[in-house]
Amino acid sequence: MKALLDLFKQVQQEEVFDAIKIGLASPDKIRSWSFGEVKKPETINYRTFKPERDGLFCAKIFGPIKDYECLCGKYKRLKHRGVICEKCGVEVTLAKVRRERMGHIELASPVAHIWFLKSLPSRLGMVLDMTLRDIERVLYFEAYVVIEPGMTPLKARQIMTEEDYYNKVEEYGDEFRAEMGAEGVRELLRAINIDEQVETLRTELKNTGSEAKIKKYAKRLKVLEAFQRSGIKPEWMILEVLPVLPPELRPLVPLDGGRFATSDLNDLYRRVINRNNRLKRLLELKAPEIIVRNEKRMLQEAVDSLLDNGRRGKAMTGANKRPLKSLADMIKGKGGRFRQNLLGKRVDYSGRSVIVVGPTLKLHQCGLPKLMALELFKPFIFNKLEVMGVATTIKAAKKEVENQTPVVWDILEEVIREHPVMLNRAPTLHRLGIQAFEPVLIEGKAIQLHPLVCAAFNADFDGDQMAVHVPLSLEAQMEARTLMLASNNVLFPANGDPSIVPSQDIVLGLYYATREAINAKGEGLSFTGVSEVIRAYENKEVELASRVNVRITEMVRNEDTSEGAPQFVPKISLYATTVGRAILSEILPHGLPFSVLNKPLKKKEISRLINTAFRKCGLRATVVFADQLMQSGFRLATRAGISICVDDMLVPPQKETIVGDAAKKVKEYDRQYMSGLVTAQERYNNVVDIWSATSEAVGKAMMEQLSTEPVTDRDGNETRQESFNSIYMMADSGARGSAVQIRQLAGMRGLMAKPDGSIIETPITANFREGLNVLQYFISTHGARKGLADTALKTANSGYLTRRLVDVTQDLVVVEDDCGTSNGVAMKALVEGGEVVEALRDRILGRVAVADVVNPETQETLYESGTLLDETAVEEIERLGIDEVRVRTPLTCETRYGLCAACYGRDLGRGSLVNVGEAVGVIAAQSIGEPGTQLTMRTFHIGGAASRAAVASSVEAKSNGIVRFTATMRYVTNAKGEQIVISRSGEALITDDIGRERERHKIPYGATLLQLDGAAIKAGTQLATWDPMTRPIITEYGGTVKFENVEEGVTVAKQIDDVTGLSTLVVIDVKRRGSQASKSVRPQVKLLDANGEEVKIPGTEHAVQIGFQVGALITVKDGQQVQVGEVLARIPTEAQKTRDITGGLPRVAELFEARSPKDAGILAEVTGTTSFGKDTKGKQRLVITDLEGNQHEFLIAKEKQVLVHDAQVVNKGEMIVDGPADPHDILRLQGIEALSRYIVDEVQDVYRLQGVKINDKHIEVIVRQMLRRVQITDNGDTRFIPGEQVERSDMLDENDRMIAEDKRPASYDNVLLGITKASLSTDSFISAASFQETTRVLTEAAIMGKRDDLRGLKENVIVGRLIPAGTGLAFHKARKAKEMSDRERFDQIAAEEAFDFGTPSTPAEEPQHPAAE
């Protein structure tokens, strides 16, 4: 019977498993895996090429070389299967068992596993409570360790040198035992009673108060508990048996010329075997201790380098002096097993070729070269040939195909029909980088690509290549067609904008056709329909741009929605339009009014047009419409015949004067600087400002001249119209080029940046049309080269950011429809510097409302909570002027191990509520990572031209209304009657008649207010002005100045300007001060009143003291009288550097890595009143007294700037010391919502600067993953340790269990982890190991006996299952359901049988799914 079963066993059923467990293998386990001991270091006989017996390739141990044939050839063929040859000892079976059968080496002396010794923190050290240094000395035979102290004063685990040992032996005789090497360590490990240790540690933890001890104990406890829980014995960290890898996994290949190519592992194994055998012999011979010891040490080193070469000491090298690749090197890094073979496999049935444009294709088609298709679809063709009877065998079919007979081409046509192929362009930065198309066979060897999908692929036709993949199975074809077909992916998943937007020629053609010209041929004619217009145009009676009146038929949605009524009805109206627009109206889809076309179609307009079409007419109509737009665009661009020549670049005549005036101004500043009125820094700042303004002015003059041209209208009057200049039209339509580039062609090139980002103050006044002289050319290349160097570096950085983001979010999938939470965040319009940066409608579009949205005027509910807010809803909300809406967010979703659809909202790439199974984590990571790469590739396009925003120096109202100040605004009135702001965080609001906020502006410290609270103002009124170049220090009190600690050469330096000879006092940096004493003092001013008394702060006993920070230029003299609101010192703002995403990418990375900034600002820990305590050396003491009267002290370095003053009320989480915010503090003091707002806004700032749109929810998804661990503060009755970080879902599950059992649940704090940390601390060890620090992750997992439940996508890809997302999620759900029902049926049958036989019923044994090892 068994033989019969074996016969069927040939086809191996794939294993079904739900989890993978990792652990340490006991020596017995290793022996049980093994098929025999490898005793000799020999590999194969160089003459016969047969493996040596008992060697590393022994056929007896590892299996036969050829299928079903023993080594000596006595037994051949299938019939002897399973026989063991008595002559050579080889089992007759498949040769591929050589890939799976392991051997082993019995070590003559135990050896420590280097991973558990050297991978930090050393696990051996933790278990034994010894330092790594000591253990190493014992293992490598430099010292003895006491095993049993006996009755001596020695302690167990004490280290002693050899001399020590011999002295002690003389002293105590054999009263005690000490050992050397791994044997000693193994005995120590065996002696440990884990349960006892855990108990003592837990009591110690409770009783100790010192932080350091708690940390140490908790760490050790964690390791010991892991051993306790997993049932792994610590002594298994010492190897007695070494497993040997199957030979096919470390092959030895004969090359021609009698040489062999071999895997490094064979060398490493050979060394181990050689040393092991020598040691065995020495032990048999009873060699002297010192020789044996040396041999044992060498064996330990050999095993070390086999496991992880180079981890300790020098790496073992081969004959060619390069380090050998050990087992650890095989799995880690980019070329290791995980990333090279498991996550990135090469794919069969694929090809690649250059792409060319295919303007005749439909959106869902691509042109596939015939030869390529023939190769890719070979198996299908063979099959068809056999079915049709053209060929009888595969071999014959192959010949047919190779000869390319006519019948083959017919079959190819047939096979390809309705069989989509996938096109991919590297780098695939987001999911639109792979799309499916229906192939159309073409001649030639290049793939044809539809022009509209280029934006999604980021492809152009300058030699890009693309890869083609064939989905083979029916399911794969179905998924490719329904989910990946190009016509189903018309929106960007990052922001929901259309991805099939026309560009370049198409835009130019459409723009040219929809422009209007004054007094063109046939102006003012009237037509009865579009066909008449076309006839007139073809007979050259009218031009495209002529203004005419046309009757146009629009198809509008039918009001009557009863059965049988048509969906659209025609509506005829007379429009004043142009010929071109009328002709275009032919392709308008049903349901769109003509008004959307009745304007010049620029790129933005076309994008909006396609968006509108998608929302109003659905996917199909949009795709058809986009295709027709493209066809028309190409045709019209050809008709337009636009070309450019040098004369199109018109240089403005007023350029000379503008540049001349600027030069004069610069001279004036130089003069002021010479006479000492301004500092060098201010002069530089001003000069740069003048030149950027000049550059703007020249650009403006040039644009004015370029953008209009004189024309005579029908009545003979001179007028101007928008220009038909080719260059202007290209830029204006958005087809190619930008205003900045035109300015460089015909205006002036302007300021250039040095590679370090600082601006060269000499601008390039010439433009490319006039030509540059040598100096100008040199300056321009200087900055431009940086762009090229940047690109290479940043692409790598951006790719790494994307990789970390994907890794942290890869297991986040939508798993249910609604988690039922009532939490959410309040969304407001994002206002910065008075500008609405992002309107409320954009922020809430596609989100689910969490509270009812109420009409503020009638108080009726507009949208109930749980409504998905779509375009119509957000427009309505905007129209009613609702300020804030509470919406669901991924951050507050209560789903465990995933997200729910309601908290996520709309799937931006599809335009409807997200489906269960969507891998929203990966999409978020792609959406954030993709523009990073895009932008880095774009830094150099403007050729390094300085794009420095002129600094704001005033703020004006954008709308009419009433000025309101926030509660934080404080100001004083100075002697001139001006109001000077002295608050740091004051804001001015403009409200409308009903009191709704229209805009808000931050008013900086030291600004002069021009409007006061309650003033009614008109749009354009200035609210406040300030000096943008310096930051003042202002006194709130009047009096006589008395300097303290202002000593020249100690705290301040006299700066004498080399040019002007004038001096100012500058506060010097603490680090540059000489003596220790001067480091702790802070230069400051006290004020004296008329009686010479110190001026006190009203209501307190504290004297007024105003400190100067580093870099301040002191403008008052000692003993000078000052009035309220006067400036005591100025702090120059730093020289501006140009910002591009170069600063941006690292900024995004540090936000997601949750790094604490270097000089972080300090936030108030409690709400209360501030006061200053006694200063200590180098620090000032700030005390906050909370509402209960408890005092909280902060010690603040003297040079830091304190934002609060005496007796000010601060709120918890408010910034009290200036500096960048620390996200960890925000989370601790202000909670998750504030943290999320901070990270989202900061990340968005970086991208917005580059004009990149990313939806907030993607960033929120990442933040959710950064918050997925919690720190246990009180463990209650749970299995956690206080201070331990655990997965939030785990903790909630455990707490639920505790509550169900009436025990105490654990309490916890939220922890913010950076993305790298979060990826490594995930519960899945497979995912973490394939990300970074493979050794450390695997070491830790093995000790803890970790179990990976294969929840994420990455783990499943690695073990080769369908991923639990999309269609795979449904598959896994169905599989689990089937298992459950099978188990129930099994129980039922068992119960019935038990009942039938009248046996006492016992619960049937459940078939468990063992976790795969």
Swiss-Prot record:
The keyword Transferase applies. One of its GO terms (cellular component) is DNA-directed RNA polymerase complex. Pfam families: RNA_pol_Rpb1_1, RNA_pol_Rpb1_2, RNA_pol_Rpb1_3, RNA_pol_Rpb1_4, RNA_pol_Rpb1_5. GO terms for biological process: DNA-templated transcription. It comes from the Bacteria. Its cofactor is Mg(2+); Zn(2+). The keyword Zinc applies. It catalyses: RNA(n) + a ribonucleoside 5'-triphosphate = RNA(n+1) + diphosphate. Binds 1 Mg(2+) ion per subunit. Binds 2 Zn(2+) ions per subunit. Its EC number is 2.7.7.6. SUPFAM superfamilies: beta and beta-prime subunits of DNA dependent RNA-polymerase. GO terms for molecular function: DNA binding; DNA-directed RNA polymerase activity; magnesium ion binding; zinc ion binding. InterPro entries: DNA-dir_RpoC_beta_prime (IPR045867), DNA-dir_RpoC_beta_prime_bact (IPR012754), RNA_pol_asu (IPR000722), RNA_pol_N (IPR006592), RNA_pol_Rpb1_1 (IPR007080), RNA_pol_Rpb1_3 (IPR007066), RNA_pol_Rpb1_3_sf (IPR042102), RNA_pol_Rpb1_4 (IPR007083). Zn(2+) 1 binds at C70, C72, C85, C88. Keywords: DNA-directed RNA polymerase, Magnesium, Metal-binding, Nucleotidyltransferase, Transcription, Transferase, Zinc. PANTHER family: DNA-DIRECTED RNA POLYMERASE, DNA-DIRECTED RNA POLYMERASE SUBUNIT BETA. The RNAP catalytic core consists of 2 alpha, 1 beta, 1 beta' and 1 omega subunit. When a sigma factor is associated with the core the holoenzyme is formed, which can initiate transcription. Belongs to the RNA polymerase beta' chain family. DNA-dependent RNA polymerase catalyzes the transcription of DNA into RNA using the four ribonucleoside triphosphates as substrates. This is DNA-directed RNA polymerase subunit beta'. It comes from Burkholderia ambifaria (strain MC40-6).
